[in-house]
Design a protein with these regions (language model features):
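Conserved phosphate/anionic-ligand binding catalytic regions in large, soluble enzymes, centered on
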Residues: 9-27
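Non-transmembrane, aqueous-exposed alpha-helical and coiled segments at domain scale
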Residues: 31-42, 70, 76-77, 102
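Short glycine-/aliphatic-rich beta-strand segments at the starts of folded cytosolic domains
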Residues: 139-152
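Short, conserved charged micro-motifs
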Residues: 116, 156-161
Length: 165
């Protein structure tokens, strides 16, 4: 059974909780996983994100999230201009991603001195999201609770060195 927040949408800049608020959250979680604002981003829109993305502000919301904006940030409609002012280059294209949820975005982020990162996530409605791929590895988390992600080389002592036991 759900709760009242499954019925009421999030406080957000509209028009769509899935295509705008969800997209902003995808961009924001991508930035958080990357650890900083990317200098360059390639954003791919799939399915209904691609079909109605411009009309619902999906493209601007994703860039806003990469800039660190929350879904209720009134600057979302100006995110393209803000990105240019802050020196973040970006490209947004439509892409057919086989087997992906209709509201899927794929983001490749790059910055000097940091390994590139590729994230794939989708908006499930009400401003909620699921991250389904991280650097080509299947994952499943929403960002609604703390999640620890460890990249591990499978060799003796590696995990022990991470957890300091």
């Amino acid at each position: 059974m759900g709760n009242i927040f499954d019925i009421l949408g999030p406080v957000m800049v509209g028009p769509s909780s899935s295509h705008t608020a969800g997209a902003a959250r995808i961009g924001l979680i991508a930035r958080q996983l990357f650890g900083r604002q990317p200098e360059r981003a390639k954003v791919y829109l799939h399915g209904s994100f691609a079909a109605t993305g411009k009309g619902h502000g999906t493209d601007k919301a994703l860039i806003a999230g990469l800039l660190g904006m929350l879904p209720d940030d009134m600057r979302i409609p100006q995110s393209f201009e803000i990105a240019k002012e802050e020196g973040m280059d970006f490209v947004i294209e439509n892409k057919d991603i086989k087997g992906a949820h209709p509201n899927t975005a794929q983001i490749i982020m790059e910055a000097e001195g940091v390994p590139a990162m590729k994230i794939q996530a989708h908006s499930i409605g009400g401003g909620r999201i699921k991250v389904c791929k991280l650097d080509g590895i299947d994952v499943n988390f929403s960002g609604e609770s703390y999640t620890m992600i460890i990249r591990n080389v499978d060799e003796p002592g590696r995990i022990l060195s991470l957890i300091h036991i």
